[in-house]
Amino acid sequence: MPFLMIRNDITKVAADAIVNPANRNLLQGSGTSRAIYQAAGEQELTASCEAIGRCDWGRAVCTPAFGLPAKYIFHAVCPAWHGGGFGEAEQLASAYHSALKLAAKYHCESVAFPLLSSGNYGYPKEQAFRIAVDTITQYVMEHDLTVYLVLYDRDSLAVSRKLFASVEEYIDDHYVAQNDESYGFGRRRRELSERRRLLEEDAALPMLGAVPAPAAAPRTARSLESLMDNLGESFTTRLLRLIDERGLKDSTVYKQSNISRQHFSKIQCNRDYNPKKKTVLAFAVGLHLSEDETIDLLKSAGYAFSDGSKRDWIVRYCLEHKIYNINQVNTLLFEYDQEQLGA
């Protein structure tokens, strides 16, 4: 844990291991494979693969990364698409799983995958994406590993049209309307509202010659110690209380929140821990909080939902519609070029 989608050139991703979509003969292919060979150093990588020989479908082997910003290259032998009736899905899932097992074998803390089989292998991108997300998610729920799925475009995202249309409408109704106001489209309404407010204030002023109301008793300044005594729960205290109230294991919550075990341990050991906002929102999803409960959790960390944040509106949509799968939430955020939740 965690699992994140990024838009990047995989040869430039800094990870312990980079996954190469390989053929059975471990020969240089086109597209992503060619880019990896060129960045690593064609002669060195070719010689290393020739020394291994062949590899079966759905399996993976390891070579040094040579010129890449990584320690290893895992060569995962991917299936080509032949209509879906020849075991392609099982072979593709096995290719991901074999590469992930190599990450454990070589004590990697992070690994970066392209969307295997989706290029020249002809696998339908949405189906390839679902297999990637399902296989990676299942693995990282049981292992401490950061996994990056490196995507070049949005075409592969398996977001249903109905869900996407619903999110679009929600954003239009909230985020876009709010920003229209910010940029002057609601200026006339604000001016009218301000006029009404001034008229109401005028009406509330005492008439000339009226008997003045008795002066209010002066407020005494509270001591700093008194103010500190009235502080609410810290973020850490509230988070741990919410976990206990729901009878959940710590590991279940941080995995469902896309948070690493090490990160959770830091929070757990520091009552005054100051989290990033994306961390708070990730725990809100992982704990299946309502919007009101999330507002309270944000407040405990010194944050609030921002009407001017598209990310916040997407998260609010997910909370309102009880979408608590962190990868589905992050897929929507990725679709809108927003920072993902978790690590």
Model-derived regions, located:
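Short amphipathic recognition helices of helix-turn-helix/homeodomain-type DNA-binding modules
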Residues: 293-342
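Short, basic-rich loop-to-helix N-cap that marks the start of a DNA-contacting helix
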Residues: 271-285
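A short, Lys/Arg-rich alpha-helix, primarily the initiator
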Residues: 211-250, 327-343
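Recognition helix of helix-turn-helix/homeodomain-like DNA-binding domains
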Residues: 258-275, 299-302
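The alpha-helix within a helix-turn-helix
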Residues: 243, 254, 284
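Divalent-metal-activated hydrolytic enzyme cores
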Residues: 123-221, 341
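Glycine-/small-residue-enriched capping loops at alpha/beta junctions
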Residues: 1-103
